[in-house]
Amino acid sequence: MKYRMNIAGLDRDLPLCKVSDDLYIGAFVMFGDAEITVACARELLARAPKDYDYLLTAEAKSIPLIHEMARQSGAREYFVARKGLKVYMPHPLHVTVRSITTQHDQDLYLSGEEADKIRGKRVLIVDDVISTGESLRAMEELVEKAGGTVAGRMAVLAEGDAQARKDIVYLNKLPVFNADGTVKE
């Protein structure tokens, strides 16, 4: 089963993936789709606040998006909250998150060097899909721990209850689905 939708002026068929017996989600994956990545970056930047210093996302599906947003905006640097601690990340900051797509606790890390750069700066948080808001909350916590300020929150798609949030900017709504592929009411 697939769900067809228009995203940043482009039609895409999202496969429906089982989360539980009565909940399916549309899988939006930008990996390998340069056309959608470029279009989404352009549309998000057109709606982005102008007063941010850095972009931040969580590993991994939003990395192509944030890279393209940095490229289009002329930003020389952006940050990716990593899902695992790496040896090249001394003095890291870390938070724990539970995401709908991973279905288990997951840690996110910023290196001490990245945290130092964020201190006193305004950070625009970017994600591919905001659903439960847990990944977003974890990135907000990392920014705050680093001494930065959240300048805004953006996503390509808002899924389920996230569509009602007033504190995020997104390009389109992504419904959640029943097992038969119909949209959940």
Regions found by a protein language model. Name each.
Residues D128, G133:
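Conserved G/P- and acidic residue-centered "switch" motifs that form tight phosphate/ATP-binding loops
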Residues E77-V123:
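Short, glycine/charge-rich flexible loops or terminal/linker lids adjacent to PRPP-binding catalytic cores
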Residues M1-Y52:
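Active-site-facing substrate-recognition patch
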Residues Y52-E59:
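Short glycine-rich phosphate-binding loop at a beta-alpha junction
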Residues L65-S73, E140:
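Short Gly/Thr/Asp-enriched flexible loops that form oxyanion-binding sites at enzyme active sites
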Residues E59-L65:
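Gly/Ser/Thr-rich loops at beta-strand to alpha-helix junctions
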Residues K2-R4, R137-E185:
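PRPP-dependent phosphoribosyltransferase catalytic core
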Residues D53, K121, A151:
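Conserved acidic residues
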